[in-house]
Amino acid sequence: YDTFFGAECGRLLSGSGGVRANEVDQRSMALWYALDRYEAFRDLDYSDADILLINRYILSNAVYQSVRDRDLGNPDLLDFVIELEYNHFRIPRADAHIVLDMNPENAYENVGKKGFRDYVGEQPDIYEALPDIQKRARQKYMEYAKRMPEIHIIPCMEQNKLKSIKAIGELIDKELAPLLA
């Protein structure tokens, strides 16, 4: 989280500022992430880029603000986040979203392998520490994939084990080949 708004997101995710991300209403939290992305893109000249690869884009914002414990039963935020980020802030619209699909247990185990992060140290962030959030997030990504054809689900598990980086990369290459031709 290198921008002003990114640092604020980091404080909310760590709880270090006295307010925790899971205590903030879902639209306000979505706005913090959108402002971070807006700030990151506003001065970036990507006009001559053939491919723009971005980690944790708008889908992540919509997913995680829609699956928090406090927001279960509230309206889904996908349409709000699309309007906010693409139409209002005019950040680049994704031609494709790649979702690396794995079982929630492995996803949770991977949180512990992230190592030191400036905003939380070695600990999981507020969302990563919430019980069942990986399971609900996975379900929400699958739901969004049914609504948006530009979402590509890449199966990363085989017989309950994570596939190799090479095998996952080959699946991504195959999935994106028609877009890059």
Where is each model-derived feature located?
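Structured loop/turn residues at beta-strand edges in well-structured enzyme cores
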Residues: 47, 92, 149
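A glycine- and Lys/Arg-enriched "phosphate-lid" helix/loop adjacent to the NTP-binding pocket
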Residues: 61-139
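ATP-dependent small-molecule kinase phosphotransfer cores
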Residues: 1-83, 87-89
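Conserved nucleotide-binding/hydrolysis micro-motifs of P-loop NTPases
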Residues: 1-3, 58-59, 102-108, 159
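NTP-dependent small-molecule kinase module
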Residues: 105-181
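Conserved catalytic core of Hanks-type protein kinase domains
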Residues: 12, 35, 56, 100-101, ...
